[in-house]
């Protein structure tokens, strides 16, 4: 168990040493009795221009936690709630067919990765190109080249956010958030996205994160197919039995009974097909 301290303030140039000193002061302890000080939440208070500062929540490892909290007598100090790690639901799938995920933006990548970790060997279909080729296609367009309707700033590995500055929009109270952020960190994102109020990966790192997620899916037995666009569904009653996929000028049929759609916001042809 650890002690949680809220509303610690830190100047913009404050470092880990200063944060530890402030935590020790809030607990009425010497710095030497602080074993670890882990940021949990960080936001910026810029209401007064002459006093811009960080507002931090930290978890502190100390001995005799309950006694420390009682002695502090502060609303800022409490015992940390025990974290509840995300556990993927038990898989009882009996179908011999692999689940299919459409779209390789954040939702599609994480869905495919979760299925791969569960041993289901998913197939991830992406109408656009792999990130390496996609970057070339977009840069060529920006230099005056032709628009590739399937490989551009909207379509391709990583989704529309690949060409943004890498800000992550998250539901801060969703218990699965920590699992998602830890997945990004394990794939190469900066560790501070775990506690920043507005987490920011950065375009350069975001591209490496996306590539690493794809490689992990493949290493776990999943398949990733670029240049493959979902174009149709076949149902028997209300049960999905097949999907149609366009690969360039060729259309093929793929047996499928489980389909996760994560096409993003610009696949209007897919939306029309689904109607």
Predicted regions and their residues:
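Residues forming the flavin
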Residues: 1-54, 58-275
